């Protein structure tokens, strides 16, 4: 790779770059990080920095761009945020002492999945994921947050589960072995927009790997460890022992389900506002914020664990003043997990240690407040709080409260902590006085009224004499430097004091650095205890947050039953209620007895069907988090999964059409749901032709009713399906109530028993502002279509979708009955033409022409 005219320094760059072809290489040269060749060209464009060249007079100048080392982090952040890797090559020796080319090495590779430092700190997790498989059917998956040390692994039995888990973790980088198929690599990189990093080597750390894991879990975890070790280039004492988890230990929800329910962010805005996380977040610590997101993402299925959380929330609700004191104390707690990680990375500065010390000063008070509740329910957290008084004393005794972030400029260690350091400081302090005395003495003796002593790094201490006073300079002064309008002088006495002061200053700075490094090393020995403390404080924080929200919004403690019944009295959609206000929101009760599995919901668009379904889902999620819920009374079974199809959105991940996504999500539900699951389908089948959609909707309802037996809400605009209640014994009809008066329709947003008698679609079109003559014609067409209404085919209840269905259809045709798949006269053609019309983009004239064409078909 070497070139004949290349300099030794550039050859060093090329040699290092050869080992990091997939990363931007930041090459430290003095006060700058330089980039060369293609890296420079690309970085200049992305970072909007100047592109210059090295050896400008050469035949082929080398493209070059650079960023100042002290502000490099902001540029690294930009590159990593865009999905790039950045290798940082530092100078490993003092350039002044180097013989030949300064030795340089890559000290860290920053990747999207290994971010520890950032100019835009975020309390959210940043997970790096590794997957491994031998047969492409069963997969080991491990994930880690390098910034907190969290490390977990699981076994998944199909790639769809892998995809869903990666999406749920919001991972941006995946570590895989070379044996993963190209098809799956394509799915990860192209369709899911993930950075793929390859790692076939494994790092076996007996302190971090649990031998009870399966071979695939161990393989994925060890590849993850090897990748982190290779990119971070140091031992990381904060990494926790890998914890095995099972998907089935939590309420299972796909990424699409969580997205449609606005759990962690508002799906329409991609912002926190309007999400369940936004509603429930009254946390006071960064660790609590992360844990709250995890609890929302993974509600429990264990009744015992749910009850533990409920009991503590109840205590917090019963003792307002103590809880208020607790909340105030939590405000003084910094991000223990990430402070511990910075210590492990060797990046913790004096301010970081001060924050840790201040946090540890708060812990005894937090423990005392929790004990003051005097409630046994809190023992589970109180007994885990480790106050670590010796560590708190070390930090707050050693680190000066005014210490800055830098560790090389002194004034970071408290006076009295080290005797030798105090001696150096005495010399420096007294030396300052000695210098002031010399200045006063020489000013008086020389008669130079403006004589003063200044200092700079080049000349040290010197007397500053202007040209107008040069004739008064004493003989014992010696010249140190000549300037345009003045000269600098020294004396033997000043030089002696200077030597003592500068020696003391250098020794003091070096000793402070050494002391700080020793203190930081002692802090590192507490990392595991700090991480356990962080988990406990985070748990307390989340529980007080849920208590505050429950109190503010008058939530109730849900009950749970084994009878597979749902009883919700005056339930509310929690986030909609907060946005609208409790006075404006119209509550709805929801009842499923043990003999009811399906609610078929009919009613106009915009009337509240989707909100009603989401209300149930959020109530289940909040309840199984261990929290209180938005209703007057709630009694639920413990669900194992929630499956939804709510909202007509295309799949932004894989580029599938609305109808294809509907069918894929319906497939996941009918294949994976159990009788302990909750299914919510909104207008399933609308993405295809009317008869196809109705046929699929009916057969899916029958399949769920006869085989799956999951609690299901099925909203539909196919009113013919309401007749299924006569054949399917565990299906009931409900509808959204409306008030019709003097030709005007009001949606009451109230759910009532029985089917809707009308769809009011034309009324919704009227609200949207369509032309009156078009609406009148639509009313006429609707009347004719209703006169030729399609009759419902009810299949035998024992098999929802079987080969016998075709025989039944043939039999009905022979008897002259209209089939679900048989269009009466030209009604189907009219419907298809209507569906194809883009109403929102029609001019009045185009609308009239369209109606004229439709009329000719009838």
Curated annotation (Swiss-Prot):
A single MF term (Gene Ontology): ATP binding
InterPro entries in UniProt: DNA_mismatch_repair_MutS (IPR005748), DNA_mismatch_repair_MutS-lik_N (IPR007695), DNA_mismatch_repair_MutS/MSH (IPR017261), DNA_mismatch_repair_MutS_C (IPR000432), DNA_mismatch_repair_MutS_clamp (IPR007861), DNA_mismatch_repair_MutS_core (IPR007696), DNA_mismatch_repair_MutS_N (IPR016151), DNA_mismatch_repair_MutS_sf (IPR036187)
Designated name of the protein: DNA mismatch repair protein MutS
Phylogenetic lineage: Bacteria, Bacillati, Bacillota, Bacilli, Lactobacillales
Family, as annotated: Belongs to the DNA mismatch repair MutS family.
Binding site for ATP: 603-610
Superkingdom of source: Bacteria
Keywords tagged on the record: ATP-binding, DNA damage, DNA repair, DNA-binding, Nucleotide-binding
Function noted in UniProt: This protein is involved in the repair of mismatches in DNA. It is possible that it carries out the mismatch recognition step. This protein has a weak ATPase activity.
One of the GO BP terms on file: mismatch repair
GO cellular component: cytosol
């Amino acid at each position: 790779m070497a070139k004949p005219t290349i300099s030794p320094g550039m050859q060093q760059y090329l040699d290092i770059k050869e080992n990091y072809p997939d990363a931007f290489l930041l090459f430290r040269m003095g006060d700058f990080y330089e980039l060369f060749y293609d890296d420079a060209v690309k970085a200049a464009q992305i970072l909007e920095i100047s592109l210059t060249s090295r050896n400008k007079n050469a035949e082929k100048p080398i493209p070059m761009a650079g960023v100042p080392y002290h502000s490099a982090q902001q540029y690294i952040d930009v590159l990593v945020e865009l999905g790039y890797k950045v290798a940082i090559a530092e100078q490993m020796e003092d350039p002044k002492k180097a013989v030949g080319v300064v030795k340089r090495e890559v000290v860290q590779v920053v990747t999207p999945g290994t971010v520890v430092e950032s100019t835009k700190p975020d309390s959210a997790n940043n997970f790096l994921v590794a997957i491994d498989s031998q047969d492409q059917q069963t997969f080991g998956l491990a994930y880690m947050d390098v910034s907190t040390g969290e490390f977990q692994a699981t076994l998944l039995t199909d790639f769809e589960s892998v995809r869903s888990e990666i999406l749920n973790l919001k991972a941006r980088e995946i570590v895989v072995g070379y044996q993963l198929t190209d098809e799956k690599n394509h799915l990860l990189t192209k369709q899911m927009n993930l950075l793929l990093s390859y790692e076939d080597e494994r790092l076996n750390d007996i302190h971090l790997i649990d031998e009870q894991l399966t071979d695939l879990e161990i393989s994925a975890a060890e590849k993850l460890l090897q990748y982190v070790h290779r990119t971070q280039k140091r031992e990381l004492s904060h990494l926790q022992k890998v914890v095995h988890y099972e998907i089935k230990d939590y309420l299972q929800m796909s990424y699409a389900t969580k997205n449609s329910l606005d759990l962690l962010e508002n799906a329409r805005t991609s912002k926190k506002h309007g999400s369940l996380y936004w509603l429930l977040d009254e946390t006071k610590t960064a660790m609590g914020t992360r844990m709250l997101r995890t609890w929302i993402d993974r509600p429990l299925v264990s009744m015992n664990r749910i009850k533990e959380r409920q009991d503590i929330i109840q205590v917090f609700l019963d003792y307002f003043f103590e809880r208020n004191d607790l909340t105030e104390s939590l405000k003084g707690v910094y991000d223990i997990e990430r402070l511990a990680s910075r210590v492990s990375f060797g990046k913790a500065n004096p301010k970081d240690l001060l924050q840790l010390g201040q946090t540890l000063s708060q812990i005894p008070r937090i423990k005392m407040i929790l004990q003051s509740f005097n409630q046994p329910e809190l023992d589970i957290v109180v007994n885990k709080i480790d106050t670590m008084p010796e560590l708190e004393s070390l930090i707050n005794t050693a680190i000066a409260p005014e210490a800055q972030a830098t560790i090389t400029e002194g004034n970071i260690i408290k006076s009295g902590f080290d005797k030798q350091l105090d001696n150096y400081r005495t010399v420096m302090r007294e030396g300052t006085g000695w210098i002031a005395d010399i200045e006063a003495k020489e000013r008086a003796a020389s008669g130079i009224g403006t004589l003063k002593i200044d200092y700079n790094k080049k000349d040290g201490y010197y007397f500053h004499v202007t040209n107008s006073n040069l004739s008064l300079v004493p003989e014992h002064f010696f010249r140190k430097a000549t300037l345009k309008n003045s000269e600098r002088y020294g004396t033997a006495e000043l030089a002696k004091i200077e030597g003592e002061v500068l020696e003391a200053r250098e020794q003091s700075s070096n000793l402070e650095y050494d002391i700080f490094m020793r203190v930081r090393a002692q802090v590192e020995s507490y990392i595991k205890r700090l991480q356990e403390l962080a988990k406990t404080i985070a748990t307390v924080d989340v529980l007080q947050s849920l208590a505050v929200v429950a109190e503010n919004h008058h939530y109730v403690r849900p009950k749970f039953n084994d009878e597979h019944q749902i009883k919700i009295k005056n339930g509310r959609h929690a986030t909609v209620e907060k946005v609208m206000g409790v006075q404006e929101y119209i509550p709805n009760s929801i009842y499923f007895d043990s003999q009811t599995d399906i609610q078929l919901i009919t009613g106009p668009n915009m009337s509240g069907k989707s909100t009603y379904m989401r209300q149930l889902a959020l109530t289940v999620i909040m309840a199984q988090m261990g929290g209180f819920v938005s209703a007057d009374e709630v009694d639920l079974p413990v669900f194992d999964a929630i499956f939804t199809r709510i909202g007509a959105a295309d799949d932004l991940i894989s580029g599938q059409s609305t109808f294809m996504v509907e069918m894929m999500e319906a497939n996941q539900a009918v294949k994976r749901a159990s009788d302990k699951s909750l299914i919510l389908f909104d207008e399933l089948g609308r993405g295809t032709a009317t008869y196809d959609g109705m046929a699929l909707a009916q057969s899916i309802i029958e399949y769920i009713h006869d085989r799956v037996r999951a609690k299901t809400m099925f909203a539909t605009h196919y009113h013919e399906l309401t007749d299924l209640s006569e054949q399917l014994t565990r299906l009931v009809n409900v509808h959204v109530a409306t008030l019709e008066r003097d030709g005007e329709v009001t949606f009451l947003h109230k759910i009532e028993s029985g089917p809707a008698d009308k769809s009011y679609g034309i009324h919704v079109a009227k609200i949207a502002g369509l032309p009156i003559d078009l609406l009148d014609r639509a009313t006429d067409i609707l009347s004719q279509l209703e006169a030729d209404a399609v009759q419902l085919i009810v299949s035998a209840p024992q098999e929802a979708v079987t080969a016998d269905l075709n025989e039944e259809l043939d039999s009905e045709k022979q008897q002259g009955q209209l089939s679900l798949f048989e269009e009466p006269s030209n009604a189907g053609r009219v419907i298809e033409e209507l569906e194809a019309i883009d109403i929102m983009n029609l001019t009045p004239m185009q609308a009239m022409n369209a109606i004229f064409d439709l009329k000719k078909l009838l």
